[in-house]
Amino acid sequence: MNDSYANLAIVIATKHAKCLPVLFASIDEYVPKEVTVIVAGSDLECSRHNTICLPNNGNNYGESYNDVVRYAFEMYPEIIVANDDIVLTPSSFDLLIEDKILLSHHSLGWLCSRSDYVRGLQNIRNGEVRNGIKFVEENQIFQSDVLSPLFGIISREAWIDYKPINWYSDDIQCLEIRAAGYNNYVSRSYVHHVGSQTVGMDHQKNDNEAKTWIKANMLELYELWFS
């Protein structure tokens, strides 16, 4: 038993819970049982882990995760935020923790897993040099301005609440975390991501709703990004 894992929780918010049984099966298989799981929006429990089930009263991604993260940080100094539509591999958790230890003196904000359904350099399809069927870059930790925390670890000190929107909430949060003096990193860890199972596949709707909020509340950022 690793006593340090008793001070760590995996935090999930869900609306439909379509993929939650598979995620929980992978947590049960690959995550030490000392880690607590906190899920908002479902009564489903992991079979091997202490599971705390909460309501999900948020109207969007930002509100839903803010609520459950605040709850978790009342008990835990650091948490792993997980999307409800990912699947862990045998090394997802272990590599994330190993990389966090390696970066312990780097003013760590987000440290997030790579995936097959994610934008930018966090996607495993990015790379220049092959090593067998993988890219060499997949075995490297690197810094990034903006990340998608599909499976990412963060401390209570570094956390900043999401804006109350679906799209762009993680972009804005990452920028604010960097402005507060922390650095965001991509881990060597990998998770499979189904994608868009909670916010839906109507990309135009998600884009328009987020842009409307940003324009009304963060006009300078709106003009920088979208004008």
What is each stretch, according to the model?
Residues V146-L147, F151-G152, A158, I165-Y190:
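A short, conserved alpha-helix in the catalytic core of glycosyltransferases
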Residues Y185-N208:
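Active-site donor/metal-binding and catalytic loop motifs
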Residues G132-I154:
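A recurrent flexible, glycine/aromatic-enriched loop bordering the glycosyltransferase active site
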Residues F93-S107:
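Conserved donor-nucleotide/metal-binding helix-loop-beta segment in metal-dependent transferases, i.e.
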Residues Y76-V87:
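Short beta-strand-to-loop acidic/aromatic patch adjacent to the donor-nucleotide binding site
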Residues A25-E34:
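Short, acidic, metal-binding catalytic loop of nucleotide-sugar glycosyltransferases
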Residues H106-I124:
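Short beta-strand-to-loop element that shapes/binds the nucleotide-sugar donor at the catalytic cleft/hinge
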Residues N56-A72:
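Glycine-rich, basic loop-to-helix element that forms the pyrophosphate-binding segment
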